[in-house]
Amino acid sequence: MAKLTRKIPKKTKRKFSRGLVHIQVSFNNTIVTITNLKGDVLAWSSAGACGFKGARKGTPFAAQIVAETAARKSFDRGLKQAQVLVKGPGPGRDKALVGLFKAGIQISLIRDITAIPHNGCRPPKKRRL
């Protein structure tokens, strides 16, 4: 006698219309993470994942491509409006926002959450070229 197999329903991906875009920009790399309002990750992208290597990962162009890639991934999940949290001193801060605009995500808020030391660690010495 053949065994009966139960069909397990396939999990459907939930649609989210609003979310948060976390942009972490350093001098060496750019990482964009898109979450829902609870903080669950919907999509992410980084300069290395987009095919940039070495010093090109820290460029403004790489930041724009990274933001577009992550935004397209989340746009497929239904994201239309987002709040943007930018962290870090890198050169791609503004271009990452341009990438989000190009992908068609409406930005309702831009907040800078870069950590500012209250005279904490000693900064690295200045370069002499």
Swiss-Prot record:
Pfam families the UniProt entry points to: Ribosomal_S11
Keywords, alphabetical: Chloroplast, Plastid, Ribonucleoprotein, Ribosomal protein, RNA-binding, rRNA-binding
A GO molecular function for this record?
Answer: structural constituent of ribosome
> What GO terms fall under cellular component here?
chloroplast; ribonucleoprotein complex; ribosome
Lineage: superkingdom? Eukaryota
Assembly, in brief, is: Part of the 30S ribosomal subunit.
Family per UniProt?
A: Belongs to the universal ribosomal protein uS11 family.
Descriptive protein name: Small ribosomal subunit protein uS11c
Q: Which gene encodes it?
A: rps11
